[in-house]
Amino acid sequence: MQRIQLAEDLQFSRVIHGLWRLNEWNYSDAELLSLIEWCIDHGITTFDHADIYGGYTCEKLFGNALALSPGLRENIELVTKCGIVLESPERPAHRSHHYNTSKSHILASVEQSLMNLRTDYIDMLLIHRPDPLMDPEGVAEAFQALKCSGKVRYFGVSNFKDHQYRMLESYLPEKLVTNQIELSAYELENMLDGTLNLCQEKRIPPMAWSPLAGGKVFTENTDKDRRVRTALESVQGEIGAASLDEVMYAWLYTHPAGIMPIVGSGKRERISAAINALSYKLDQDQWFRIFTAVQGYDIP
């Protein structure tokens, strides 16, 4: 498994396991532990969480499984996010869906995540979404307090556009080390609007959520779906990939930004597709055939 350097003493596995839908997998603690161990055995050591996943339940489910084998903690990297507030039975005091990136909320969210995940520290904390009411000085104070206490090692953001990223980072004593963005061989917005360019400018490898675009290309039948599917099938035959999943992952891996896809499945065979795709590299012709199919028109 390739390793991606994010900071001097922090590496992530190229493939990241996402726990967004963990509560829907209906795994026992022992079954989830088995999946975590399988991931580690196959080189996947980075696990992506958020406080709100599963209506505030997924972190706790993961922590319960990890508690069965506490020694595994030193072999993995934990990512979590905060800043979104949801109405939920798990949070009866919440009255509406809104953002909260205040210093007090960030600190309280991290304390809860540490308890949920059964750990003393988080490797990476991300601000989940840009907050139009964000006080960047308060965020900086929260990050500094968490860093000094050893509760969070590094910080990043999620879904930030380039101007939002630059604004927040300008207040921080240390640079952000990733931006988790939607990116796939189906959704190109962040590749075309400067967001991915900023990651390259800053030398920060991005994390990519929804790298298979939620499966739309496999299940829907719009003009775009048919175009992209045809291009993927053409490249699949040329490189000998076992599935269209593998082609979509290989398309991301071919980009020089060091994109780390987040695989949000509890099925080993679906996770394996992201691993297997590391053995493929598309040439320019193959990569641009897919790119052009997604856009729906030829490049200039």
Swiss-Prot record:
CDD domains: AKR_BsYcsN_EcYdhF-like. The keyword Oxidoreductase applies. Pfam families: Aldo_ket_red. GO terms for cellular component: cytosol. NADP(+) binds at residues 210-220. Its EC number is 1.-.-.-. Keywords: NADP, Oxidoreductase. InterPro entries: AKR (IPR020471), AKR_Detox_Biosynth (IPR050523), NADP_OxRdtase_dom (IPR023210), NADP_OxRdtase_dom_sf (IPR036812). Coiled coil: none annotated. GO terms for molecular function: oxidoreductase activity. The active site is at residue 53. Belongs to the aldo/keto reductase family. Aldo/keto reductase 2 subfamily. PANTHER family: NADH-SPECIFIC METHYLGLYOXAL REDUCTASE-RELATED (PTHR43364), OXIDOREDUCTASE YDHF (PTHR43364:SF1). This is Uncharacterized oxidoreductase YcsN. The gene is ycsN.
